[in-house]
Amino acid sequence: MPEIHPSAVIHSDATIGDDCEVGPYCVIGRHVTLGQGNRLHSHIVIDGHTEIGSGNEFFPFASVGVKTQDLKWKGGTTWTRIGDRNTFRENVTVHSATGDGEATVMGSDNHILAYSHIAHNVLLGNHVILSNNGTLAGHVIVEDYAIVGGLAAVHQFCRLGKMSILGGCTKVVSDVAPYMMVDGNPARTRAVNKVGLERNGVTVEAQNAIRQAHRLYFRKGLIGANAVEVIRAEVPQLPEVEHFLSFVETSERGVTR
């Protein structure tokens, strides 16, 4: 059975899973589904058509699933879908999608730190860290194991590649390639995210191949398709390199140089 504080306001149609803890002054809307073992400390608002998995933890004043800030919103049913074992620190905001039938989606094992904002239609993978006051604008895609530094802001429709890292206060207006370290305003690709690769168990062989790809793509003055051709010809085609190439080839906003 869930443990619910008497001051919490929960709609009778909401679904609250077993072993959930709902603290003082939380508000849970009609179309919310909480899986098992979620912990809501106090003053949490979860609203809209929101589906949340198991084992998530919400700290005071987090707001999840509420109506988008996007002025293009015209009504309809929009969704917020969240996986398992995520942490939402104080004053985090996660907004629902804009278009009818669309969703803001988050995977599992993510850490969303205090005052961060996840806007409408964001697709956020697994094992992501969004540091304090980090901002993801609408339709941003964040791949697994990416880290967004404190006060960093990501423009709408940008993508952050797997195991990439943004320095604090970075302003991102184009895609950030996988495995790269990006910093500054305007943002620049500074180096390979060596520490991130090591922490996530990337092999030495793959790390060396990623460094080769980085040097050819960012440091040799090659442009676009020419850089991709050279990397395919000169760098071992390991899965990490293929992912890097697939990412940069499909970029619509360009890659942060």
Language-model regions: role of each:
Residues 3-183, 187-188:
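Structural signal for interior beta-strand "rungs" in well-ordered beta-sheet cores
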